[in-house]
Amino acid sequence: MIDNKIHQYIEKERSKPFVWGSRDCNTFVLNFIDSIYNLDLEKKVKGKYKTEFGAIKFQKNFGQYLSEYLISNGGKKILPTQATIGDILIIKKGVYELGHICLGALVAGCLEHESIVIGRVQDFNSF
């Protein structure tokens, strides 16, 4: 049942464009977690920045990376090789982290200048 909810979420979000602060890699992941587990994690982030520079500034003021925020709200750290459908995969890129959703052998992420990108897990670090 949860696999079905995950795939429904991805299909619903696939065509939506990237927008800093409301539809970027981190809000995509937080909204996903909220919709699957009936939480409200995205509200602390959504709409707080509108540019990449704004995201970096917000990150500094927020005081937690995405991974730390998820762990402080009940998540746990695992190796990417242990990820299963619905797990969150995070890439550290410079001064911030990029969140993605594991779909089994595939991974979904929201990248700038694109809508949802789906790629193979083994290509995960090249996103």
Segments predicted by a language model, with ranges:
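Non-catalytic ligand/cofactor/substrate-binding and regulatory segments of enzyme domains
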Residues: M1-S15, E112-F127
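N-terminal capping segments
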Residues: M1-Q64
